[in-house]
A protein has these predicted regions:
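N-terminal secretion/transport leader regions
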Residues: 3, 243-244
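Short acidic, low-complexity intrinsically disordered linear motifs used
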Residues: 1-9
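Core nucleotide-handling region used for phosphoryl-transfer chemistry
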Residues: 9-47, 52-243
Length: 244
C-alpha cells in the first residue's frame, strides 16, 4: 500500500481497536528499531515476552447474571445495557455475515466462553466484570479464519481488561495479568477445554540468542539501512518520515 497516495484510516480489532505492531509506531526512531532488533536477536530482552496473536477480536463481560459481548463501542455504554446478549445474541449478530467461517468462529467461541464464565462463582464474576463496567478483551484463533499467521489450534486467548463509565468512555485498565487470572479461574473449574476451543491467556515467551546471529542481524539491519538510504534519512529520524 502506498501510504502517500492511500491515506485512509483502517479500523480493526472490534470495539477495542487495532493493537499496533512495532513498525506502526511512527514516533519511533530508526535507531530504536535497530536497538530492538539487536536485543531480540541476542536474547537481550529481559523478562517474559507476550506474543501478539493474529485472530478475531471480541470483548466479554457479565451483567445481571448474563454473559454479554461487545463488537463496537456502543455496546459498552450504560455498562453493557445494549450489548450483545449471550451466545445466542452473537449468532444473531453475525447471522448475515457473508463468510461462514467467521460466523462459526464467533458463534462457537461465544458458546464456549459463556459456558466457561458461567462456571465461575458469583463472587468471581463480580470481581472480574463488576456487573458490566469491566470488560475483558479476547482473541479468537480459528484456523479457518486465518489473517496472516496460520494456527493449528482453536483457541480463545484472554488479553487485558478495560473499565468504562456509563457513556462508554475508558476510565481504567491493564495490559498484563487480568487475562491470565480469568483463564486460571476457568481452568480451576475444569471448563477451560470446551466443545470447540481451549480457553487460555496470552502466550508468554522467552527469546534466546539466535544461532545464526551474524547473518540474521545483517539481513534485518540491512533492510533498515536500505530504507533510510532510499528516503535520505538518518538513524535519529522517526520512521514516520518514510511514510509522509
Amino acid at each position: 500500500m502506498n501510504f502517500k497516495a492511500y491515506n485512509r484510516v483502517i479500523e480493526e480489532g472490534g470495539a477495542y481497536g487495532h493493537m499496533m505492531n512495532v513498525h506502526e509506531d511512527y514516533t519511533l526512531q530508526f535507531e530504536d528499531l535497530q536497538r530492538i532488533i539487536k536485543q531480540a536477536l541476542t536474547g537481550g530482552i529481559k523478562g517474559e515476552i507476550k506474543e501478539k496473536t493474529d485472530g478475531q477480536a471480541l470483548a466479554v463481560s457479565h451483567r445481571a447474571n448474563r454473559v454479554i459481548f461487545a463488537r463496537n463501542k456502543g455496546h459498552y455504554k450504560a455498562f453493557g445495557k445494549n450489548a450483545i446478549r449471550g451466545a445466542k445474541g452473537i449468532a444473531e449478530f453475525f447471522g448475515e455475515h457473508p463468510n461462514d467461517n467467521v460466523k462459526e468462529a464467533f458463534t462457537f467461541a461465544a458458546k464456549d466462553l459463556e459456558k466457561g464464565i458461567m462456571s465461575l462463582s458469583d463472587r468471581q464474576k463480580q470481581m472480574m466484570f463488576g456487573d458490566g463496567w469491566r470488560w475483558v478483551n479476547i482473541e479468537i484463533i480459528w484456523p479457518a479464519t486465518v489473517n496472516v499467521i496460520p494456527y493449528n489450534h482453536e483457541l480463545i486467548v484472554l488479553h487485558n481488561f478495560r473499565e468504562y463509565d456509563e457513556d462508554g468512555n475508558t476510565v481504567g485498565g491493564d495490559f498484563n495479568e487480568y487475562g491470565r487470572m480469568l483463564a486460571g479461574m476457568i481452568k480451576q473449574t475444569n471448563e477451560h477445554v470446551q466443545d470447540k476451543f481451549t480457553i487460555t491467556s496470552m502466550p508468554l515467551l522467552k527469546m534466546p540468542r539466535v544461532k545464526n546471529f551474524e547473518q540474521t542481524i545483517g539481513d534485518y539491519l540491512g533492510e533498515i539501512n536500505n530504507l533510510m538510504s532510499k528516503y535520505g534519512l538518518n538513524p535519529g529520524d522517526k520512521i514516520g518520515r518514510a511514510h509522509v
